[in-house]
Amino acid sequence: MCEFITGGGLCAAPLPESLAKEGALMRDALLHDLSRLPYSVITTVDARLNVPEHCDECVIAHANDDIWRIWQAQIKLADAVFLIAPETDGTLHYLTQMAGLEGSLVLGCGLASIKVSSEKMATCLALEAAGIATIPTYTLDNWPKSHWIWLAKPNDGAGCSDTACFNNADDLQDWIEQNDKQLTHVIQAYQPGDAASISCVMRKGKAHLLSCNTQEIEINNHMLSYKGGVINGMREHWQAFELVANQIAKALPDLAGYVGIDVIVDNDEVIVVEINPRLTTSYVGLREATGKNPAELIIKTLTQPRFKWPKLQQNVVNFHV
């Protein structure tokens, strides 16, 4: 099991506390769930952090180590690989490709869907082509600049990272130009409604819902930040979320394993913001929310074609990051 941030992905660079905290939450929850299953689990950890519990072996990554060689060596030892990594700079795509080349079973999405969902512009185009409601996405060259609230986001960013919001087009353009974001960022109009997310498991064009969640997003000095949410805080929208998740699964059929979908709910319309082809922070509350071991559900869905999806509890769980 590889969690990029805590597992040594930044071993030769500064380790931001917020990223390490969020990564550790996902890592520890997944390791706990995997430890309840009949597998030996190996992982890696940045030398600046404590060795995690619930693993059979942990390789420590120091600042002078080649972390990619370490991961490649561990992948060679494994029968299956669970990857948690940001889409930014192609990191998740590269790790997934590495695991595939070593012949390991990747308990996650395929390369094609990772490539599309890693880029906001490509995601928008794929969703629009499939007739799925989404937020129109522009570059600085084709942006309409109408009177509205606008957001600038990294085209390949994850979550709220480096995302700015301004009440008028001129201020947003000034921010983009002053911070040299012309080539890295795309522009979206602010979409009114309730920020939410879908946690689900996908395989071969079919989606199974784990939970329907609210998201807590803060805006401070024009910059967005993610603070957590409520697992199943949107359970009244289960049927609508399930429909959207299955539409996405059909549009991108090699989405596999855990997939997180960020959405806006506006007067019962579900508008897709982005697709996360990997574990999201919502995973930390899923064991309590579902009454099941989510890691077991993911593995059985991917490895047992006739696996019958069980009835899940829909408990409400608060979490913060």
Residue map of PLM features:
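Nucleotide-activated donor-dependent transferases that construct or modify glycoconjugates
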Residues: 1-19
